[in-house]
Amino acid sequence: IHPHAGGYIEFADEIDKIMEDIPAEVAGLCLDTGHLRYSQMDPVEWLRKYADRLDYIHFKDINEKVYNEVLSEHIRFFEGCGKGSMCPIGTGMLDYPAIYKLLTEEINYNGYITIEQERDPRNVATSLRDVKKSVDYLKSLGFE
């Protein structure tokens, strides 16, 4: 189960309800740091809360200035991505050193993590450049 900003399972109460209703042996959870923060949740708190249900993690970061503009203008999620609400990891508002510490020292997560760069799909060069920046930043924290 992958909660997603702009989707049917997005907010804290919806995530809690579906985790309550669906047994762990039936479905795990793919938490997305960017979608959690976009929907007003602290990724560290939620990764900790559902550590025992984590099957997979998606990493992304949010440009705070663009994010605030998108929210104030009531722009839909994917249109906001096209405007640059998502940015290279390490350049936005998420606390990746805290996420790294949680995953490696506290919950000992050893599963897969996908770096996502949600951008205007017509601008492939920018997306690839941003993914490289994200990889370089995450490696500097200690991610392999």
Regions found by a protein language model. Name each.
Residues A12-A27, L31, R37-E144:
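Histidine-acidic metal/acid-base catalytic patches
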